[in-house]
Amino acid sequence: MSTPEQEVEYRQHRFSPPPGATEIFLVRHGESAPAKGDNPFELVDGQADPDLAPEGRDHAERVGRRLADERISALYVTTLRRTPQTAAPLAAKLGLTPEVEPDLREIHLGEWENGLFRRYTYEGHPIVEQLWREQRWDVIPGAETMESFGGRIRAAIGRLAAANPDRRIAVFTHGGVIGEVFAQASAAKNRFAFLGADNGSISHLVVSGENWMVRRFNDTSHLQSPFG
């Protein structure tokens, strides 16, 4: 019979990634420059490509400080300049050159690129109401289909995971992309359930083969954002 000193303790399980898994920190780019009717955004491959706003550059610096000690092995950005601008402070701290992953660029908004989506959202356009009601981007004229968007996102995450087993990577991307990743990871019935990651926020995904595990969503503690 065991004595109290010999009793075995059964502690709560602490998560650790499975062997061969990839930890991905998904960072939404910092706040970008505002859309103005008399100064439309430059387009890259048909998509709006604004620079970071001053607030966004501050977000980038804060992200760099937050992730500097997280044992990150590789950085990825998209073809849109706000993502490499956000990644720059962390890249400088780690001495890493970001790689471009084109398929993690933002959803293509068709005829509503060039800042029109922001304008029509502000004005309460009927199609914006339809978009939220139906949980589909492709109600916007000419927009990328949900099937195309979801497919390229899943393929890109799979490629990055396959290239980085047992490593941590940071991916600087966009709000729509992060929302789609976490909707797929959680099998959410509401396709827009995770739409709304804040600028400069950090979300944490663990990928092990076809298994995507949500560890953290929309962490903004480094931005000193109040609740609300």
Over which residues does each language-model region extend?
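Glycine-rich phosphate-binding loops at beta-strand->alpha-helix junctions
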Residues: 82, 177-180
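Active-site signature of alpha/beta-hydrolase-fold catalytic machinery across serine-
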Residues: 89, 180-184
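Phosphate-handling substructures
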Residues: 50-51, 94-154, 215-218, 227-228
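Acidic, low-complexity terminal tails and accessory targeting/binding regions
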Residues: 1-23, 66, 99, 107-119, ...
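Short beta-strand scaffold positions
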Residues: 77-78, 151, 172-173
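Generic structural signal for well-ordered alpha-helical scaffold segments
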Residues: 61-68, 150, 154-162, 182
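Active-site metal-binding loops of divalent metal-dependent hydrolases
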Residues: 30, 175
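Active-site-proximal alpha-helix that buttresses catalytic centers in soluble enzyme cores
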Residues: 2-25, 31-100
